[in-house]
Regions:
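Inter-Walker segment of RecA-like/P-loop motor cores
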Residues: 180-228
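Walker A/P-loop
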Residues: 124-146
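Conserved Walker A/P-loop ATP-binding site and its immediately adjacent core
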Residues: 155-180, 197, 287, 356
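SF2 helicase catalytic motif II
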Residues: 221-224, 234-271
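Conserved strand-helix element at the start of the C-terminal RecA-like helicase core
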Residues: 157-168, 344-367, 376-377
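Interdomain hinge/linker at the junction between the two RecA-like core domains of SF2 helicases
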Residues: 277, 284-344
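Conserved helicase motor
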Residues: 165, 190-203, 354-357, 375-392, ...
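Accessory nucleic-acid engagement/destabilization modules that flank
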Residues: 1-93
Length: 411
């Protein structure tokens, strides 16, 4: 909405030109105003990236100010103590969860290899990449790697940064099943932070918004906006980031291309100076940091190791490409013909359309053609609760041999 447009307003040439022309004068005035409060020699003494250092200091100040004010008006939680990360214990719990999934088929074996490869990867630098296809088990495999790294790095917390709110719920459900230890409250251990998240009480909402939980699952927009936000609600949680491990899924599409150079600079500073560790992942990862606009920047270019060895990557990709068949038509097709063309393919089938309106219309057409019980409609036009119910229903149908045997499952 308007907030996003303002956040990225430097896309306008006139705005950038005006900033370039006035920035030196604005900095001069700023330094004149604060020189008595913060002596220039004190700032100059910091050996690293001063802009990030000052934002961290401002974050601490903003959080302290808001926390004290809330306490004075008795609006702060009575207990702010969140569970510690307890990485070694959670890794053992995750190992048990994954081993219990079982399965003797080829896909299960590949997923076990993927899990072991990520968990046991020996990475000592600030970055790693995980390039493996959808369905290979990245949700648990990368978490195992992060927990193993947390033990070695004495990390404070883990962030899981996902591109869409629609897939956050699925990941949160898995993490809460696999990582919560006896006596803990799931919402306190794995925090779900996005615009559609529901909270059991106001205290949980408050502490989740401040990134106090040991594991935080959030959207790319909410995460990266925090790094640059002037809004106190976001700024005050920034100081919780140092010493953290961050898993960015769909890494190359997490931000608009024009913002990647600045974000990449921040990520390097956080890795080099603030003990952060980044795992950049995707089903088909574009190594954007090797492109000229980023590789040409005057900053150290880190060596980014792969969590998964090349032969396992190829095997996973080969299996997934044989498991899922993509079909398309070069020539346009009418509404009446589309359901019949889809029906020609063996089930289960997933039909993806370009708008929520088209999805609703075609779902109705297919329901009229094959019956309501054989069609599932899933889009952001549905409420979050209805989407969750639909996804649960799809899972049950996929697990039902009778449904698959009839080959009529379509959504």
């Amino acid at each position: 909405g308007n907030r996003m447009e303002l956040m990225f307003r430097d896309e306008e040439t006139a705005s950038r030109k005006h900033t370039d022309q006035t920035l030196a004068e604005l900095l001069k005035r700023h330094r004149a105003c604060v020189s008595d409060l913060v002596p220039p020699e004190l700032i100059a003494a910091y050996p690293g990236e001063q802009s990030v250092f000052l934002r961290m200091a401002l974050s601490c100040l903003a959080d302290a100010d808001h926390t004290d004010t809330a306490a004075a008006y008795k609006q702060a939680p009575e207990q702010e103590q969140m569970p510690p990360l307890r990485a070694e214990e959670r890794l053992a719990a995750l190992d048990r969860y994954v081993s219990a999934l079982g399965g003797d088929d080829a896909r299960s074996e590949l997923r076990r290899q993927m899990y072991a490869a990520c968990r046991d990867a020996k990475i000592t630098d600030g970055f790693a990449a995980c390039d493996s296809p959808v369905g290979s088990g990245k949700t648990t495999a990368v978490m195992a790697h992060l927990l193993e790294q947390a033990c070695k790095r004495n990390a404070r917390r883990i962030f899981v940064v996902l591109p869409y709110t629609s897939i956050i719920r699925q990941s949160v459900d898995i993490y809460r099943k696999a990582l919560v230890l006896p006596g803990e409250t799931p919402e306190d251990v794995v925090a779900e932070l996005h615009s559609r998240a529901d909270f059991e009480d106001i205290e949980t909402r408050y502490l989740t918004a401040l990134w106090r939980a040991p594991i935080v699952v959030t959207t790319a927009v909410a995460f990266f906006e925090t790094l640059s936000s002037h809004n106190p609600a976001a700024l005050r949680r920034l100081h919780e980031l140092p010493g953290s491990l961050i898993f960015v899924d769909e890494a190359h599409s997490a931000l608009p291309i024009r913002l990647l150079p600045l974000a990449w600079h921040w990520m390097n500073v956080l890795a080099d100076e603030w003990s952060c560790y980044w795992v950049l992942a995707c089903g088909s990862l574009v190594r954007y940091w090797e492109l000229q606009p980023l590789s040409g920047l005057s900053m150290p270019q880190p060596e980014i190791a792969e969590l998964v060895r090349p032969d396992l990557q190829r095997e996973l990709s080969r299996y997934e490409s044989s498991r899922i068949t993509f079909r398309w038509r070069e020539k346009p097709i009418g509404r009446k013909e589309l359901p019949k063309w889809v029906q020609e393919a063996p089930g289960p089938r997933l039909l993806i359309l370009n708008t929520v309106q088209s999805a609703a219309v075609i779902a109705a057409d297919m329901a009229a053609e094959f019956g309501q019980t054989h069609v599932e409609h899933l889009s952001t036009a549905l409420t979050p609760e209805d989407r969750g119910n639909t996804i649960d229903r799809i899972r049950r149908r996929l697990a039902d041999p009778e449904q698959l045997g009839r080959g009529l499952l379509q959504f």
